[in-house]
Regions:
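Secondary-structure capping and boundary motifs in well-ordered enzyme cores
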Residues: 9-10, 60, 94-97, 199-201
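Hydrophobic alpha-helical interface faces used for helix-helix packing
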Residues: 87, 109, 121-130, 134, ...
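Short, surface-exposed recognition loops and adjoining beta-strand edges that mediate ligand/DNA contacts
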Residues: 34-43, 55-58, 79-131
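Conserved hydrophobic/amphipathic alpha-helical signal-anchor segments
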Residues: 1-58, 62, 73-83
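Alpha-helical scaffolds flanking conserved acidic
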Residues: 14, 98-100, 203
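Generic structural signal for secondary-structure transition and capping sites
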Residues: 26-29, 76-77, 110, 204, ...
Length: 324
């Protein structure tokens, strides 16, 4: 398949995923959560044990991709899922390995096959102690917005609830268009269930989905496994492992936790040259496909203006994004 045909096929995939998000919203009056979790104030879960000691995330973990299965003709998989039970339940082990074609970009030179979940040391990992937790792959990811708010951060009150909904007041100074010390947000995050009325920048001006080739790191349609770590498959000056939320989510920057060698917050659009497991990454020549909240698909050149990309990644900051 030629590059142009692969790009068109990919655009069709991500368009169908975007339309499925809209169908989900019509059925439920909100978009699916980026992923579902039951964090608590003291870092404990009902058993009294913190599954993820950094983010305090717990079960069930199901991500946006798992929730739209009935809308992408994958109802046979969805019917076997208990969305209130953990991803890693024994009853789910075969289902979560499913290779679902719409989640796979034909341009990705990385694996299409399911992958083994790993921990910080890259050893096989599962919260229940099993070492064979294998997840179906996705080359498409949901937009978390500008910040990488998927764990307690310096300056927070260190309570798990702070990232359950739209984030609390910013603790770091980041400036875009003169707006200092803000935490920007996108439509997908822990327990988000964003209502369309909250996308005040407009669904036609807000990035919902993008690409992430498995050449860079492993992503899944299934969801988030608390305590897992996403590792890069090649290194760069800014690249390193990141938390389990990046199994399904990416962000645009700027994020106060990610600074370049000059100390300036990084914005990383599609194919940003230093790479990052929590960014959009495509193998199409020159850029990658993104899907906006209205289901429209756009090919973003990898040289897109950084501020424009960041502005399109937030859903309710009131920016007027530039040309793209």
């Amino acid at each position: 398949m030629r590059a142009a045909a692969r790009r068109v096929s990919c655009a069709n995939n991500i368009r169908q995923l975007g339309l499925s998000l809209l169908n989900y919203e019509s059925a439920h009056q909100h978009f699916p959560a980026g992923y579902s979790s039951t964090p608590t104030r003291d870092g404990s879960v009902p058993s009294g044990v913190a599954i993820d000691s950094v983010t305090w995330d717990s079960a069930p973990g199901w991500g946006w991709g798992a929730h739209i299965l009935p809308f992408i003709e994958a109802g046979n998989v969805a019917r076997g899922i208990d969305y209130d039970a953990p991803i890693w339940n024994a009853a789910h082990r075969d289902l979560i390995r499913a290779q679902i074609p719409i989640f796979l970009c034909p341009s990705s030179s990385g694996d299409n096959e399911p992958f083994v979940v790993v921990d910080e040391s890259e050893s096989p990992y599962s919260p229940d102690g099993n070492t064979d937790l294998i997840l179906g792959r996705s080359h498409y990811v949901a937009s978390h917005g500008q910040e990488s708010a998927w764990g307690p951060e310096a300056g927070s009150d260190m309570t798990g609830e702070i990232f359950t909904d739209i984030y609390t007041a910013a603790t770091r100074g980041v400036s875009i268009n003169g707006d200092v010390s803000r935490v920007a947000d996108g439509p997908f995050y822990r327990n988000s269930e964003t209502k369309i009325s909250r996308v005040t920048d407009g669904t036609s001006n807000t990035i919902f989905l993008g690409e992430h080739s498995s050449k860079l790191s492993d992503k899944t349609w299934v969801g988030v496994v608390p305590g897992a770590i996403v590792h890069p498959k090649f290194s760069s000056p800014e690249n390193g492992p990141d938390g389990a939320a990046t199994m399904v989510l990416v962000h645009a920057g700027p994020s106060g936790g990610e600074l370049d060698i000059t100390g300036f917050p990084i914005i990383h659009p599609v194919n940003f040259p230093t790479f990052h497991v929590g960014q959009m990454f495509s193998e199409h020549p020159g850029g990658g496909n993104v899907c906006f909240g209205d289901g429209s698909v756009h090919f973003f050149n990898e040289s897109i203006d950084l501020i424009t990309f960041a502005e399109l990644s937030s859903m309710n900051e009131g920016e007027v994004a530039g040309e793209y």
